[in-house]
Amino acid sequence: TGKPGPVLIDLPKDVMAEFGSAEYPKNVNIRGYKPNTSVHIGQLKRALKMLSKAKRPLFLAGGGVNIAHAQEVFREVVEKTQVPVVTTGMGRGAISTKHPLFIGNLGMHGAYAANMAVSECDLLFSIGTRFNDRITGKLHEFAPHAQIVHIDIDTASISRNIHVDIPIVADAKEAITKMAEYVEPCSTSKWLAQIDAWKNEHPLTMRQNGVMGPLDIFNAINEKFDDAIIVTDVGQHQMLTSQYVDITENRQIIMSGGLGTMGYGLSLIHISEPTR
């Protein structure tokens, strides 16, 4: 139902001590939650028309793109349109971080160029993100010049934190696949030049003091471990890994998102790929 992922069910101790039996239904029927996750073609075409007319369009890819395994078709859409991409932390890897149209992560743990692109874009085309406070900052200052398209499988996420101009409730992969059928190239050369200027003005880096530091470790990972699954725990190293480790078609990253569950990393090493 809606956004997939873990759910916390908190039961009193005396209930947990009782015995019982349960059967999980094949079809879950929740009276108050019945989203239609099939792509509304009319809404999608409106969004794509808006995209084609934008002078400073920007894709925002969230974790929903990765959960839906939509990376390949998303890259196809990005390359067809020539629209640059920023990602959330959980969206990292939606497109290779080495791709020329990838700018960086946005938000409080993001890159200068990515945050400037969000601030100056005139269309923010968002897919699979819930607009949490780590990426938005002050809500009334977020993407102040932009019309916003929001594609998300969870109807409860639409316009919850950020008002959107075109809402589309849909599975990310289904929506992006339909986009690939209809999108046309956008005129973004001047916009891309401005983004490159921001990248050169404030590149993502950290201070070096002559001894081995985090950047040396991340550079070694990028150089030596091409086919790897990167798993982080929670804390500053998680944010730095999300910023500095390149995530490509061969190298994946797994980390905890909103709940910040410390101890997550060790268990994920065991269950993500137990044969490796």
Please provide the spans of the model-predicted regions.
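Glycine-rich phosphate/diphosphate-binding loops that line cofactor/substrate pockets in enzymes
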Residues: 1-3, 43-58, 77, 118-120, ...
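Conformationally flexible catalytic loops at phosphate/diphosphate-handling active centers
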Residues: 2-53
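Glycine-rich, acidic loop regions that bind phosphate or pyrophosphate groups
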Residues: 11, 91-194
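Glycine-rich beta-alpha junction loops
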Residues: 11-16, 63-65, 92, 155, ...
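Gly-rich Lys/Arg/Thr-decorated short loops/hinges at beta-loop-alpha junctions or inter-strand turns
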Residues: 22-32, 94-98, 194-205, 250-252
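Active-site diphosphate/adenylate-binding microenvironment
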Residues: 196-268
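Conserved small/polar residues in nucleotide/adenosyl-binding loops
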Residues: 269-275
